[in-house]
């Protein structure tokens, strides 16, 4: 058995917290393994003044980390699953996920509790086309402006009046200890579907690395692993980029069946379609693909 692991991750406060959560899981099963964090600055971290869809999408948060994996400079990588494209290099595999945190989005605003309450022509900071699509559906009068940066910097921009409100993932706020109920308000799934895989911490390794696979098999949270399959299959089939508004939310109906709500829009957010699919866990991937095909056809009509 190996005695040390090099774990690659982004150098942001949230990424480091999430990596330590993975290390805690590893230590539960392999207390004698030494885990060394290797912080990696990614292209997505360096370019903050442009929306992701103009500079290569969320894959920019993975590119340098995955290259370090391929070059064997690290042994495994930790990601927010919502940042992982539907298709990754064939030499790599998402081999484990931790238990999913509440995947809902949060409306962050000092003076109002919901998007509907905002005064006319207020400014919401968000660079996600998914969130923009929902905002435009609820309040077409609002202005959505580019809003990049880590959670702390976005909240600081809000506090200084750069925008009237923003929308962030609850999971990140909770892990950072930054969820403040005075100005953080959960958005229900019926009002805004989360991003694919939102709330899930993922572990990526090389396909043929049996030592890492053994570790990942132990820390993998199987119920979450099954839950995200239809969401990931939907994303992979669409081969979508950051210009395509996509939302998904999966939940167990019982021990054997999963319900997934899907949202898909065209790039300019002028048309959005919704669909709900119920599948057995054994066929949940097929359910995601079926939904993608059906919704693509609906958008073309």
Curated annotation (Swiss-Prot):
Co-factor binding details: Binds 1 dipyrromethane group covalently.
Catalytic activity: 4 porphobilinogen + H2O = hydroxymethylbilane + 4 NH4(+)
EC number assigned by the record: 2.5.1.61
Keyword entries, A-Z: Porphyrin biosynthesis, Transferase
Gene, per the UniProt record: hemC
Biological pathway: Porphyrin-containing compound metabolism; protoporphyrin-IX biosynthesis; coproporphyrinogen-III from 5-aminolevulinate: step 2/4
Quaternary structure, from the entry: Monomer.
Function: Tetrapolymerization of the monopyrrole PBG into the hydroxymethylbilane pre-uroporphyrinogen in several discrete steps.
Leftover remarks: The porphobilinogen subunits are added to the dipyrromethane group.
Cofactor(s) this protein requires: dipyrromethane
Enzyme class, first EC level, given as a word: transferase
CDD domains: PBP2_PBGD_2
PTM-bearing positions, type S-(dipyrrolylmethanemethyl)cysteine: 242
Name of protein: Porphobilinogen deaminase
HAMAP family: Porphobil_deam (MF_00260)
MF term (GO), any: hydroxymethylbilane synthase activity
GO cellular component: cytoplasm
GO biological process per UniProt: protoporphyrinogen IX biosynthetic process
Family: Belongs to the HMBS family.
């Amino acid at each position: 058995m190996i005695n040390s692991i090099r774990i690659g991750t982004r150098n942001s406060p949230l990424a480091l917290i999430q990596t330590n959560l993975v290390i805690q899981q590893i230590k539960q099963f392999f207390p004698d393994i030494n885990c060394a964090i290797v912080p990696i600055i990614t292209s997505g971290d360096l370019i903050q003044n442009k929306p992701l869809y103009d500079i290569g999408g969320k894959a920019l948060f993975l590119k340098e980390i995955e290259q370090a994996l391929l070059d064997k400079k690290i042994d495994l990588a930790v990601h927010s699953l919502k940042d992982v494209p539907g298709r990754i290099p064939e030499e790599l595999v998402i081999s484990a996920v931790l238990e999913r945190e509440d995947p809902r989005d949060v409306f962050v605003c000092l003076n109002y509790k919901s998007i509907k309450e905002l005064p006319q022509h207020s400014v919401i900071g968000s660079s996600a086309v998914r969130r923009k699509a929902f905002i435009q559906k609820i309040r077409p009068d609002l202005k959505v402006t580019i809003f990049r940066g880590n959670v702390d910097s976005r909240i600081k921009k809000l506090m200084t009046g750069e925008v009237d409100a923003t929308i962030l993932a609850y999971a990140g706020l909770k892990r950072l200890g930054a969820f403040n109920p005075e100005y953080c308000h959960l958005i229900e799934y019926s009002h805004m579907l989360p991003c694919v895989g939102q709330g899930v911490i993922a572990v990526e390794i090389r396909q043929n690395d049996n030592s890492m696979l053994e570790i990942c098999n132990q820390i993998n949270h199987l119920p979450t692993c099954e839950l995200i399959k239809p969401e990931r299959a939907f994303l992979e089939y669409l081969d979508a980029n950051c210009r395509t508004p996509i939302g998904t939310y999966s939940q167990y109906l019982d021990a054997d069946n999963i319900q997934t709500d899907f949202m898909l829009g065209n790039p300019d957010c002028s048309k959005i379609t919704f669909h709900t699919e119920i599948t057995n866990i054994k066929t949940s991937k097929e359910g995601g693909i079926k939904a993608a095909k059906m919704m693509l056809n609906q958008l073309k009509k």
